[in-house]
From Swiss-Prot:
<dbReference type="InterPro" id="IPR000640">
    <property type="entry name" value="EFG_V-like"/>
</dbReference>
<dbReference type="InterPro" id="IPR020568">
    <property type="entry name" value="Ribosomal_Su5_D2-typ_SF"/>
</dbReference>
<dbReference type="GO" id="GO:0003746">
    <property type="term" value="F:translation elongation factor activity"/>
</dbReference>
<dbReference type="InterPro" id="IPR004161">
    <property type="entry name" value="EFTu-like_2"/>
</dbReference>
<dbReference type="InterPro" id="IPR009022">
    <property type="entry name" value="EFG_III"/>
</dbReference>
<dbReference type="InterPro" id="IPR009000">
    <property type="entry name" value="Transl_B-barrel_sf"/>
</dbReference>
<comment type="similarity">
    <text>Belongs to the TRAFAC class translation factor GTPase superfamily. Classic translation factor GTPase family. EF-G/EF-2 subfamily.</text>
</comment>
<dbReference type="Pfam" id="PF14492">
    <property type="entry name" value="EFG_III"/>
</dbReference>
<dbReference type="InterPro" id="IPR031157">
    <property type="entry name" value="G_TR_CS"/>
</dbReference>
<dbReference type="GO" id="GO:0005737">
    <property type="term" value="C:cytoplasm"/>
</dbReference>
<dbReference type="Pfam" id="PF03144">
    <property type="entry name" value="GTP_EFTU_D2"/>
</dbReference>
<dbReference type="InterPro" id="IPR047872">
    <property type="entry name" value="EFG_IV"/>
</dbReference>
<feature type="binding site">
    <location>
        <begin position="88"/>
        <end position="92"/>
    </location>
    <ligand>
        <name>GTP</name>
    </ligand>
</feature>
<keyword id="KW-0963">Cytoplasm</keyword>
<comment type="function">
    <text>Catalyzes the GTP-dependent ribosomal translocation step during translation elongation. During this step, the ribosome changes from the pre-translocational (PRE) to the post-translocational (POST) state as the newly formed A-site-bound peptidyl-tRNA and P-site-bound deacylated tRNA move to the P and E sites, respectively. Catalyzes the coordinated movement of the two tRNA molecules, the mRNA and conformational changes in the ribosome.</text>
</comment>
<feature type="binding site">
    <location>
        <begin position="17"/>
        <end position="24"/>
    </location>
    <ligand>
        <name>GTP</name>
    </ligand>
</feature>
<protein>
    <recommendedName>
        <fullName>Elongation factor G</fullName>
    </recommendedName>
</protein>
Amino acid sequence: MARTTPITRYRNIGISAHIDAGKTTTTERILFYTGVNHKIGEVHDGAATMDWMAQEQERGITITSAATTAFWSGMAKQFEPHRVNIIDTPGHVDFTIEVERSMRVLDGAVMVYCAVGGVQPQSETVWRQANKYKVPRIAFVNKMDRMGANFLKVVSQIKSRLAANPVPIQLAIGAEEKFTGVVDLVKMKAINWNEADAGVTFEYEEIPADMQELAEEWHQNLVESAAEASEELMEKYLGGEELTEEEIKKALRQRVLNNEVILVTCGSAFKNKGVQAMLDAVIEYLPAPTDVTAINGILDDGKDTPAVRHSDDKEPFAALAFKIATDPFVGNLTFFRVYSGVVNSGDTVMNPVKSQRERLGRIVQMHANKREEIKEVRAGDIAAAIGLKDVTTGDTLCDPSNVIILERMEFPEPVISVAVEPKTKADQEKMGLALGRLAKEDPSFRVWTDEESGQTIIAGMGELHLDILVDRMKREFNVEANVGKPQVAYRETIRETVKDVEGKHAKQSGGRGQFGHVVIDMGPLEAGGPGYEFVNDIVGGSIPKEFIPAVDKGIQEQLKSGPLAGYPVVDIKVRLHYGSYHDVDSSELAFKLAASLAFKSAFGKAKPVLLEPVMKVEVETPEDYMGDVIGDLNRRRGMIEGMEDTSTGKTVRAQVPLSEMFGYATDLRSQTQGRASYSMEFLKYAEAPNNVAQAVIEARGK
């Protein structure tokens, strides 16, 4: 089958924003104008096409980034049809992982800002992620019809808060209830959308007289910005020559692709104004797959030889799985982005990350939650495969005869864990199945069984993250669960060496007795090593060879639950150097018990301590809140390591015990009016101060 749309006419874009900037409404309008959607779904009615999970409709926030394909030929049908693949991304901080993964597979992004709220905290986080993946972007200032809307104020915030270089290509005509349309600063015309057909048609008009001067000023700003694209244009501009519309657009496009400027558009998605022109800007200024740098990877040749794949049908097939979703009708849907080559349904592909081949059964293109089955996908396409068994997020799919592993995505370690148990015994198996499914969909979510308590533990990126997962278990798998309090994983160890500690197990009660006797030395090992070492220094057969493994085993069993508070014991070395035995009464069991008695006695004498997990915490905050943030980290027993300037404020680096970090997201939000963001990851185990250790030991003893 030949390609229906040339790859130069593809646009793979994300629509990204803070929680209430009106991103879902904006996406809905895009689907409407591109002719995909015939009835406009309103978020307030819970009927928006993109927000297809039940919780999203209730909470009115977007959780899963749905990928949708649409076609656009321009507001005035001025282009050939372009294929626009849209990935809708969530705006809540606990779902940052979703934003991160969609940024990884996009070529460009539209940042939606609220004309009233401006650049809000999550906008800053999303901005940093887009910077990390060098995603070219344009901005859409939405909600121009709302009380307090101010387009130019938002433009200046993009400059001050995001340290970006915003270049408006439009101005708003009026604001609040007087918002009627926009001025196109390239054409220097006013655009007026017809309300009778929900803005499908429009007229170009003269710029209102009272805006003439302002429009001229911003037109000059735009032309100057375009002229900076090349020396040639700059000379022409400085020589007083007019730049043509085509020259301006070409130059601005070049600067967007180089991440030098952010073009800013505006409108009110709700009032059907502006989205149409923003779509034109997507086509005119955002990159096609052929405009972005080739994707890097490594060959599967044992030497990790670097390799690249270009956006070209002729190159070997290579794709990246960026999302797994469970569909009630077809099971697993694996969303993937094709970087190079062509693949047909029915083909076998290689997953080099898992060293497995899989057959691509059916391939579907998604329109929000509707599906269209297709026979093949080519470079630049975003589609979903049905029935891939072992693919997880971040895996590569490629041609089995040209194996390449594309750059993997990085997923943070979960930072909060809670115990969950099904409300009824009958749900136990269903819960295991549900948690397995959810963990496969979401790489930032982990599940394991606590060996001591037998409880199922789930861990994730934040409290809302875990709430939603528990909620999904109930809705999608009909499993109701009780959820425990967040927990910290402590450890126990010793600080001193003790010698010649005895352990004797002797029992005589008629018939055959039991006898085992060991003498050990015990001392600390360096952290980060094997965690446990056993040395057999028995000479002269004071303990027969066959009982030595039983001594080792007896000690290892004690390591699982330490004498202090029942937490695992780490970093100790045990030397067995003497003992005695009885020809008849000695047995493996007797020596195992003798060893455990010796261990307990030695552990108590060797200055036992409790270790707590310490996290590496980075807080990015506007400078005004710096003092509050540092004071708060100090109160949490944090050790400030350093500070540095960033484009949006300051970054504070600190080491903070995990037990002090519960509820931090909420506290940080209220301290900084939601303008700071933080990340944390596990750093090391360190000795807990006496008062903390005592409190933990007492709580465990209850």
